[in-house]
Amino acid sequence: MIFTPPARADVRRIDRDTAMRILTALDRFARTGEGDIKKLEGNTGELRLRVGDYRVRFIENPPGTLYIHAVLHRSEAYR
C-alpha cells in the first residue's frame, strides 16, 4: 500500500480503532480482492472501499499494489 501525503494525513485524523479497521480492510482487499468495493464513474480506474462511515479512494496497479488517494468520512467523500 502506498499512501499519498493527503491520504496519510486523512488517516492520522481518524480515531485509532477506525483507522485500524480501514487498514485491515485495505490489506484484506490487497491480498484477496474481497471487500465492499465499487468502481467509481469516469475513466480513471479509481476504486472506492467502504469501511463503516469511511470511504477510501484508491487505484490498484499492478494487482495487489494499492495507491491510496483519500480516506474520507462519507459526508465528505462524494462532494
Spans of features found by a protein language model:
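Enriched for short, Lys/Arg-rich terminal
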Residues: 6-9, 13-20, 34-35, 47-54, ...
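Conserved N-terminal entry element of GNAT/NAT acetyltransferase domains
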Residues: 1-5
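A short, surface-exposed loop/turn module that caps and links secondary-structure elements
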Residues: 24-49
